[in-house]
Design a protein with these regions (language model features):
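Charge-dense, helix-prone N-terminal extensions
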Residues: 1-145
Length: 145
């Protein structure tokens, strides 16, 4: 069975973010880092080449393939900031209030924080984290939307 490419590393998250050349993207990345620390209460970890993740989620498919990934995370890509949220965020009612964004198969992409409502983004990250933690109704665990 193929091994996961994206694994937790021991690399410094701060060093990685400080290596970002674009000052705006660097500042946004540090702001997102603080948001996710606040939401999760967990330390950030570098995953793979360019992802920052919080928490650990073990998955297993019917095929028998299993692995570990972070519960929520983000990546400061060259063209955009990618957010890795648990499945279900795309249909969250707050998505219509977020602002300028694009959705990928498993991620939410924005160009910069100024393009979105940070309070809404915060709540969507919170939703993703609580959803990945299990439970019947992640909405019930959230502060009011």
């Amino acid at each position: 069975m193929a091994e996961n490419k994206t694994k937790e590393t021991n690399e410094s998250v701060d060093d990685f973010l400080n290596s970002i050349e674009h000052e705006g993207k660097k500042a946004d990345s540090f702001r997102i880092l603080e948001m996710m620390k606040d939401i999760t209460g967990l330390p950030p970890k570098k995953w793979g080449d360019a992802m920052i993740g919080f928490g650990n989620y073990h998955y297993k498919y019917k095929s028998g393939h299993e692995g570990d990934i972070f519960q929520v995370g983000f990546s400061p890509r060259k063209s955009y900031l990618s957010f890795y949220l648990f499945y279900g965020y795309k249909h969250h009612p707050l998505m219509t209030k977020l602002g300028k964004h694009k959705g990928g198969k498993a991620c939410l992409n924005i160009n910069k924080l100024a393009d979105v409502d940070e309070d809404i983004l915060y709540k969507l990250i919170e939703f993703g984290f609580l959803s990945s933690a299990g439970g019947d109704n992640p909405y019930a665990k959230m502060e009011s939307c």
